[in-house]
């Protein structure tokens, strides 16, 4: 038993630990993890609001407190739904900004500007505007994959342009805030000039906007990730990483959060 245990430890240390270490330092895994972490407070508060909106009592209860709570929530349901709709209902806003800011920081970019650029890139393809209204269908969980892709893409474009000095540079005498705004003009133009035509092309060819197309392609993978074997494998890998002295939860959730 001792030799078997030592063999298992050796295999983990030689094979799994280096891989886990590389995953844990991977820029995109870190950015995705940070994006979901940034959105977490808003999602928690939004989830709590559902308890107030839908009290855990039977509609025919005779308890005075429960009856009052049910009547109050029914009468003010629209008002109580507002915090939920502006937190859980637009979770991809927070996720896209968090991913863009985290990835931008890792590429030595202005995290505020990279986060805002990621936010704009997501809105451009996921919130179609028609008849004076913006569609919110893909601003919640259905748009998570689109938020990941557009945030990573827009930040990479920003990083590449800055690394190759394809930016507008103002004299040092110009205030820093103004200079930062002009520096991101070209990245904004490139992101709009690539994502918007792509979205229009996909819609013309398939009748679906980009978030719909992404969800259609990834539907089998999402279904597979919700299966018992996938969940058991994720838990197993998490424990193996912990056993190897690595924060398994950060790595596994950073990869699997978009699917869960």
State what each model feature region is.
Residues 57-73, 256-260:
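Membrane-interface interhelical connector segments
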């Amino acid at each position: 038993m001792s030799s078997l245990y030592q063999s298992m430890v050796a295999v983990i240390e030689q094979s799994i630990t280096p891989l886990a270490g590389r995953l844990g330092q991977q820029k995109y895994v870190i950015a995705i993890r940070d994006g979901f972490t940034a959105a977490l407070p808003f999602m928690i508060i939004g989830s709590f609001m559902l308890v107030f909106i839908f009290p855990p009592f039977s509609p025919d209860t005779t308890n005075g407190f429960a009856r009052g709570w049910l009547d109050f929530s029914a009468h003010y349901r629209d008002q109580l739904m507002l915090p939920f709709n502006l937190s859980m209902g637009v979770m991809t806003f927070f996720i896209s900004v968090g991913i863009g800011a985290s990835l931008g920081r890792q590429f030595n970019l202005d995290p505020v500007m990279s986060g805002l650029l990621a936010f704009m890139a997501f809105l451009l393809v996921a919130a179609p505007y028609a008849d004076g209204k913006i569609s919110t269908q893909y601003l919640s969980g259905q748009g998570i994959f689109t938020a990941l892709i557009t945030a990573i893409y827009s930040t990479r474009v920003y990083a590449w342009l800055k690394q190759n000095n394809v930016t507008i540079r103002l004299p040092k005498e110009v205030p820093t805030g103004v200079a930062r705004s002009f520096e991101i003009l070209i990245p904004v133009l490139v992101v709009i000039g690539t994502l918007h035509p792509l979205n229009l092309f996909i819609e013309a060819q398939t009748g679906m906007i980009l978030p719909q197309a992404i969800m259609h392609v990834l539907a089998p993978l999402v279904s597979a990730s919700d299966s018992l074997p996938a969940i058991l494998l994720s838990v197993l890998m998490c424990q193996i990483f912990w056993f190897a002295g690595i924060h398994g939860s950060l790595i596994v959730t950073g990869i699997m959060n978009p699917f869960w």
